[in-house]
Amino acid sequence: MNDVSKASLPKAIFLMGPTASGKTALAIALRKVLPVELISVDSALIYRGMDIGTAKPNADELKAAPHRLLDIRDPSQAYSAADFRRDALAQMAEITAAGRIPLLVGGTMLYFKALLEGLSPLPSADPEVRSRIEQQAAELGWEALHQQLQEIDPVAAARIHPNDPQRLSRALEVFFISGKTLTELTQTSGDALPYQVHQFAIAPASRELLHQRIELRFHQMLASGFEAEVRALFARGDLHTDLPSIRCVGYRQMWSYIEGEISYDEMVYRGVCATRQLAKRQMTWLRGWEGVRWLDSENPDRARKEVLQVVGAIAD
């Protein structure tokens, strides 16, 4: 698409960044001065009853700056990148029709990628194939199926853990249905996003600062009642660690503590480490991201001004 036709598209803003980088605070500050509406881009914030461990904006923040695509699923339900793209496009169209600008804020980079580039045409689930895979898993174990995937699609196997039956099963299912690997198919993009997007990423200047922010926030979550939140989820009886919700960073470690598998101190240590690993993955995505402007977490006022300099002109 050339620059002229791009300029005629409706505007949108992406505000990306690793966990604990100050994205939400900046988005709320921007909403006070720009005609924007916020859309959450976070695979954990979609779940109801998971507020503390996901650092969901509190009631006062949501009153000042409502976020769309929060609390849209029960923790027992799955939600895919395709689901997100469909829902986000609908929200963006609604916001644009009202004469405002969608500001998409979050750290789930796969969602941003799916929205920006479109999704590859993966085959629909096939209950018969899925059943056959589950039967194999019952007989041989998921480790053996992971070995099978390693031979078929080593790239996907390196990314998918043997203890992640949902994703492992899907990767095998895609191959058995289509004869093509998940890696091959995901290299084929679908429809690009029909918006002129201004992309920003916010992060601290150093890894050490980010690690400090992560550790501080994890301890703040614990002080705010994170354990009680997870105990309430545990007490439901229908949730387990194979679900994407309970595999969320922090929740998985607290779950292990509640089940008596690890001590409290070990839970804290693992929770902080897992959050750091998440931030590392997010930063890896962002460093390879094209067309992104970087903002400094440690100077939120300057970050706000930098966004306004770029975006102010499109908000008139």
Swiss-Prot record:
Catalyzed reaction equations: adenosine(37) in tRNA + dimethylallyl diphosphate = N(6)-dimethylallyladenosine(37) in tRNA + diphosphate
Cofactor(s) the record lists: Mg(2+)
GO biological process per UniProt: tRNA modification
Region (Interaction with substrate tRNA): 42-45, 166-170, 247-252
Enzyme class: transferase
UniProt KW keywords: ATP-binding, Magnesium, Nucleotide-binding, Transferase, tRNA processing
Entry's EC annotation: 2.5.1.75
UniProt-annotated site: Interaction with substrate tRNA, residues: 108, 130
InterPro entries named in the record: Dimethylallyltransferase, IPT, P-loop_NTPase
UniProt: substrate binding residues: 19-24
Domain of life of the native organism: Bacteria
Family, similarity comment: Belongs to the IPP transferase family.
Function in brief: Catalyzes the transfer of a dimethylallyl group onto the adenine at position 37 in tRNAs that read codons beginning with uridine, leading to the formation of N6-(dimethylallyl)adenosine (i(6)A).
Subunit-level organization: Monomer.
Name assigned to this protein: tRNA dimethylallyltransferase
Organism: Salmonella paratyphi C (strain RKS4594)
Source organism phylogeny: Bacteria, Pseudomonadati, Pseudomonadota, Gammaproteobacteria, Enterobacterales
